[in-house]
Amino acid sequence: MLSRAGLTLVEVLVALTLAALVLGTATVSVLGQQRAHARLRAVLDADAQISAAMTVLGEQLGMLNVRQDLMSGEARDSALQFRAPVASAIACAGWAGRTTLAADPAGSVPLLGVASLPRTGDTLWWLGDSAWVGGAITAVTNNPVTCASPLGAMSGELQVTLARPDSIASGTPLRITRQTRYGVYRASDGTWHLGFREWSSKPPGFPSPQPVVGSLIRTGSRRSGFRYFDDTGAELDQGTSGADVTRVARIRFTAHAFVPVHDRGRDSVRTDSIDIVLQHARGP
């Protein structure tokens, strides 16, 4: 009679138990690696978001002039409102209440700069005899013209109409600004974010904020927000009406970003800040 080699029931149970232990260990290792990767990805994404926000703030606030660009009563811990430069040029031709932005002649030093096309509600500034004068823009059109100026023959087509009947001579330096506001706001889910808003004339006012970075911490020692300093480096008191904008020489924004990574029962906080020194050229 032939006998067949096989496994006893005890051996089968031992083999199954060992296989389960190996598979369980491998599963735990894979899950741990996935969680670690997710935590690292969340932290890196938060760092990238904060870094991008700081770059944007630095570039935009770095173009401000302390004398007129900051809005009185709007330099606060939670918000900063200012006139953001959107275009600069030389006047080509003007009539009462209208002027045209001159294009740069070929081979000349660039004088025309447009970060954003002017629109109704922006403010046009022109250099008068001893100071800058401002007027609200009521219309923007394309109207090709040529003109003579102290700089020679010029041409342009971007024309702005003002709410006041001033006449602006050819060759006059121009600057266009737009009311802009950065503010820390609370979203519908209860989280805090830094938001960006630009003034709109239709309807008049600031639209809903566009999130720049978040979610932010707004309590305790890790409080995200703006701080303001004078020429000596002393921090300015904000009181109930904000910092005195005539004394602001430097602006600091600090972001404490909350990152829900759930690492050993704890979340992560990523912190970054930027200091912007304002220009002190003759206004606006």
Language model regions located:
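Extreme N-terminus of proteins, especially the signal/transit-peptide cleavage junction
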Residues: 2-3, 267
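Extracytoplasmic beta-strand-rich oligomerization domains located immediately C-terminal to a leader/signal peptide
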Residues: 40-200
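Short linear sequence signals and composition-biased patches located at protein termini or domain-edge surfaces
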Residues: 45, 90, 176, 186-194, ...
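Exposed loop/turn and edge beta-strand positions of beta-sandwich/beta-sheet ligand-binding modules
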Residues: 12, 76, 247
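Aliphatic-rich helix starts adjacent to a transmembrane/signal segment
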Residues: 3-62
